[in-house]
């Protein structure tokens, strides 16, 4: 706001909310370059965090014996060796083909935002042609409710010809056993496809 714009109209705010992009109200005296620097730094940190988590999870799933590749990274994020974990495998099909590439990344981005805003103790990453979620210290009932809500959200973002397949592993105890939960969810998904 400033000498040319006295206030941001509700129609602008509604449009921005509908399209999922932010609207900032900034006093005229604040330099735009400083705001952009802060926003870019926050985005970069968020992307770096997502890459670290995805790498650590993929290492935990695929290279479980090489603990140095994932244990300390996940512990720094608050996921401890003695916690209980459940892996959820999400596959998106269009006709009979698994959705990949840009479309899968779009779905993961929307899902990650939804998780970040609504839940704690859930990690997400894309792997190959699927999305993987890791729930930490959720009871069976809590896990079921969360997965139902996540499934509903995924159905809302799915295109008309897309199907969402979700398989949930049994809960395992310990970060070093995460690969077992992953393998179980993977086998369940293979049976569904």
Task: Show which residues each predicted segment covers.
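Short beta-strand-to-loop capping motifs
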Residues: 90-96, 134-138, 170
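Generic recognition of stable, solvent-exposed alpha-helical segments in well-folded globular domains
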Residues: 106, 145, 177-183
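Cyclic nucleotide signaling catalytic output domains
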Residues: 167-173, 180-193
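Catalytic-site or vestigial catalytic-site microsegments of nucleotide-handling domains
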Residues: 80-98
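Alpha-helical/coil-rich non-catalytic "connector" segments in signaling and regulatory proteins
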Residues: 1-85, 103-168
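A generic structural signal for short coil/turn motifs at secondary-structure boundaries
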Residues: 96-100, 141-143, 175-177
């Amino acid at each position: 706001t400033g000498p040319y714009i006295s206030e941001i109209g509700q129609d602008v705010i509604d449009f921005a909310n509908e399209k999922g992009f932010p609207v900032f109200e900034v006093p005229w005296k604040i330099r735009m370059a400083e705001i952009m620097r802060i926003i870019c730094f926050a985005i970069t940190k968020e992307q770096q965090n997502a890459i670290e988590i995805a790498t650590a999870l993929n290492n935990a799933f695929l290279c479980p014996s090489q603990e140095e590749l994932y244990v300390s990274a996940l512990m720094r994020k608050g996921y401890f060796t003695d916690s209980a974990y459940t892996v959820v495998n999400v596959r998106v099909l269009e006709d009979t083909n698994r959705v990949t590439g840009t479309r899968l990344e779009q779905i993961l981005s929307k899902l990650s935002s939804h998780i970040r805003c609504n839940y704690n103790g859930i990690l997400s990453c894309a792997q190959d042609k699927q999305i993987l979620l890791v729930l930490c210290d959720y009871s069976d009932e809590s896990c079921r409710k969360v997965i139902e809500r996540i499934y509903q959200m995924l159905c809302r973002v799915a295109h008309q010809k897309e199907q969402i397949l979700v398989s949930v592993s049994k809960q395992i105890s310990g970060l070093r056993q995460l690969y077992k939960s992953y393998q179980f969810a993977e086998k369940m998904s293979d049976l569904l496809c």
